[in-house]
Amino acid sequence: VTFVMRPAPWGFDGRVWQDIKGREIPVDELTPGAALGARGMLERFARTYAAERGSFYRAAAAATRADGLPATLAAELDAAAERIEGDAAQDWVQGTILWRALTERVEA
């Protein structure tokens, strides 16, 4: 079963998933195994997003240097990449309501 994050009809609260067929499933109704899989998907999303964004910022910083633009701009782009790479992405995802709800369900 493939799950994607979707806002609940009453507003995003981080506790509702929508499956591939469009059915909305509250996190509380997922089996612990499905919640574990969903949590893994969320963690992979954070790592992938951080890697892609980090690469974008690093490439922009390199282009800035190559084009002779101010060094402060390149430094800001490098700093932006550092803020979202590696542990920062994992810390962010573990701070979300959805990750905590899935973890509670896994441990239930």
Place the predicted regions along the sequence by residue.
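Alpha-helical propensity feature that highlights long, continuous alpha-helices across diverse contexts
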Residues: V1-A108
